[in-house]
Amino acid sequence: MSEKIVFYGKEQLQRIRIFNYSESNDKTLIVLHGGGWRDPRNSYNDFEDMANYILEEKKATNINIIGIDYRLSPFIKHPVHLIDVLTAFRYILENYKTGQLSIVGHSVGATLLLEILNYVEIIQTGLEQLETSEPSIEELQTLFDFISKNLTFKTMYFLDGIYDVRALLEEYPSYDFFVKSAFVSTVAIEEASQLSWKQHNEAFKIAVDKYEILHSLEDELLSLNQPKLFAKYLQDRKIECSFRTGNWGEHEQVYRSQAVSEHVLQNM
């Protein structure tokens, strides 16, 4: 299939980009962009270089590659970003033969990957803070049931991510300007991540074979504190993970790194 844009919802950013797809392929790579929950300059197009490396340079056309966009703050608030991503997954799984799924999340895309692992608790608590009646309980339950039955991953790649927003603000108080755009309260911030939540203590609900944490040593926006916190969280719970660093460029360059793309390709 040639490249294609498909909508999974009614809004402009509720869309996916099909970089490559064939029903005969038995692996699918999903790519999920960052941008601080709010930056329209970030989209599934961030991963064009990675897709081109895998498909053109390495000739790995036996891999489906699909990018997900989601609505942005301040127009929507947490946990609606996560609901959009799960809705996109339902659309993909209902309409395409994906085979074995792996996913790359960059920056807050990596945050969303972590949230996916306990999507029920995080969405329910987030909606309580948001005080909204949409989506309905019935709509959410249908989505939750589908995800529970159908979504598993071979590999999750967490790329220069944010895993504990509370700790992020302690380290970088100036980042408050974009965090407040995405969250309605301090409680919403704390309960959005397993590393800081207080109301839950749940095991991950989505099966994942491999956790790959990657962080560029040249990242000018995020220190190694965030990936170290996440790696410790996993290790404390006896969950195996790989934690790698390298000179892969600045924050908005790391997903363009051929070394990162090669690592993704080799570990699917």
Curated annotation (Swiss-Prot):
Gene3D superfamilies assigned to the protein according to its UniProt record, in alphabetical order: alpha/beta hydrolase (3.40.50.1820)
Keywords recorded for this protein, A-Z: Hydrolase, Tryptophan catabolism
Active site: residue positions: 107, 219, 251
Catalytic activity, EC: 3.5.1.9
Alphabetized GO MF terms: arylformamidase activity
Biochemical pathway: Amino-acid degradation; L-tryptophan degradation via kynurenine pathway; L-kynurenine from L-tryptophan: step 2/2
GO biological process: 'de novo' NAD biosynthetic process from L-tryptophan; L-tryptophan catabolic process to kynurenine
Motif HGGXW: positions: 33-37
Catalytic reactions of this protein: N-formyl-L-kynurenine + H2O = L-kynurenine + formate + H(+)
Function statement: Catalyzes the hydrolysis of N-formyl-L-kynurenine to L-kynurenine, the second step in the kynurenine pathway of tryptophan degradation. Kynurenine may be further oxidized to nicotinic acid, NAD(H) and NADP(H). Required for elimination of toxic metabolites.
Summary of subunit composition and partner proteins: Homodimer.
Free-text note on domains in this protein's UniProt record: The main chain amide nitrogen atoms of the second glycine and its adjacent residue in the HGGXW motif define the oxyanion hole, and stabilize the oxyanion that forms during the nucleophilic attack by the catalytic serine during substrate cleavage.
HAMAP family (UniProt xref): KFase
Family the entry assigns: Belongs to the kynurenine formamidase family.
Protein name: Kynurenine formamidase
Species assigned in the record: Scheffersomyces stipitis (strain ATCC 58785 / CBS 6054 / NBRC 10063 / NRRL Y-11545)
